[in-house]
A protein has these predicted regions:
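Cross-family detector of peptidyl-prolyl cis-trans isomerase
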Residues: 7-144
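Bacterial N-terminal signal peptides
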Residues: 1-7
């Protein structure tokens, strides 16, 4: 009696979500003539004004004003209100990006889906969306 072993090779699964996001981001950067810096995590950013040395850390509380939109220009948050929150409560792309600027600083973040909401859809944000934020860090403080 012979034993037969079946092997299924699933080498060709297509591009990963990370690869798809990076292709979309690179096309967006090229189309909009942007000069971004890319971190190891895949976050792209432009610092317009680093400002002072009071940079937030993971546990800092921040007050920020921002506009958030998708790569196709769909605005999901118009920045009409200030955000007052502990940085640790934000998406990973914000946590990483905002630590690069100080109080009063301004930047652009282009966040791949794994550093945003991933496979979770939000009100105006489809699942696996690359997010773009124009941010101004108004204040950094520690809540006591």
């Amino acid at each position: 009696m012979g034993i037969s072993i079946l092997s299924f090779d699933s080498c060709d699964k297509g591009p990963s979500q990370e690869e798809i996001d990076q292709e979309l981001i690179e096309a967006y950067i090229l189309e909009n003539n942007l000069n971004t810096t890319k971190t190891e995590s895949g976050l792209h950013y432009i610092i317009y004004d680093e400002c002072d040395d009071n940079h937030p850390d993971y546990y800092s509380f921040i007050i920020a004003r921002y506009k958030g939109y998708l790569l196709d220009g769909t605005v999901f948050d118009d920045g009409s209100q200030e955000l007052n929150v502990q940085l640790a409560q934000m998406i990973p792309g914000w946590i990483e990006g905002l630590q690069l600027i100080g109080e009063g600083g301004e930047m652009l973040l282009i966040i791949p889906s794994n550093l945003g909401y991933g496979g979770i859809a939000k009100a105006k944000i489809p699942e696996y969306s690359v997010l773009v934020f124009e941010l101004k860090l108004l204040q950094v403080y520690d809540k006591k």
